[in-house]
Amino acid sequence: ILGVSVMTLSRHLNQLQHRVGTSLLTRHSKGMQLTNEGSRLVEYLERAEAEIEAAGSIFEARGQSVSGTVRIAAPEGFALKVLTPNLATLLREHPDLNVEIVPQTLGFSLSRREADIAVMVGHPNEGQLHSELLGTYDLGLYASESYVTAYGMPTTIDELLNHRLIGYVEDLLFSERLNIARQVASEWVSNLAIYSPIGQVEAVRAGLGIGVLHEFLLDHDEGLVSVLPELRFSREFFLVSHPTTARVPRIQAMLTF
């Protein structure tokens, strides 16, 4: 990608670390990761890149498309049901723009430059990030009509806990804000645990149990019925970016589309 060999890149990195007098990267089982000092240096470099690109854009012909790659980290449901279907207009306007959509995994950090932009559930708790409220979404308990016919409809939380329950694989959750099931009942134990909210919708639709589902994923599915409808939950989506890169044309195009 950089047009240089690994050996050359390693040599330049070692020279840079020697010059600044500290380690900028650490090695681990999955590759390399920026140290705190490395992240601070990247902030300065990205600010310089943003200023250079912004200055260059002054001389670009009006209407000229931006180019390059923007990486967006987003929850699966938002990425597949909201973001992806709305990209056509943006990419038609900027045909030289490439977009990478990646999942938010446990330990994800936008501050460590793991993505250019992130869509997060709840306000980010990392400093030095710009955030903007995108909107809210609702969640509720649902079962399939076939499940209710076979096993009955719970009318209390105690009755609910005696049913087959569907939820997340809890130790893979990148945010506790997603663990709505524990808000329903601290004793909640998922008989079927699925990492994917879309997978949970499909499992409930198949009659495998009762789950807390994102309502924007349901598409007014007539095969599902609300369980304990008085239990409603809301969460917020925030658009989060690095202040130092917001003026880079390709990132600005994505932030404003």
Predicted regions and their residues:
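Residues within the DNA-recognition helix of helix-turn-helix
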Residues: 5, 12, 86
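The DNA-contacting recognition helix of HTH DNA-binding domains
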Residues: 6-7, 80
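Central regulatory/effector-binding core of bacterial HTH transcription factors
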Residues: 67-127
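C-terminal regulatory
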Residues: 112, 124-237
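Alpha-helical linker/hinge and terminal dimerization helices associated
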Residues: 19-20, 41-63
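Conserved amphipathic alpha-helical core elements
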Residues: 16-17, 224
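A short LG(V/I)-centered, amphipathic sequence patch enriched
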Residues: 17-34
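A late-sequence structural motif
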Residues: 230-257
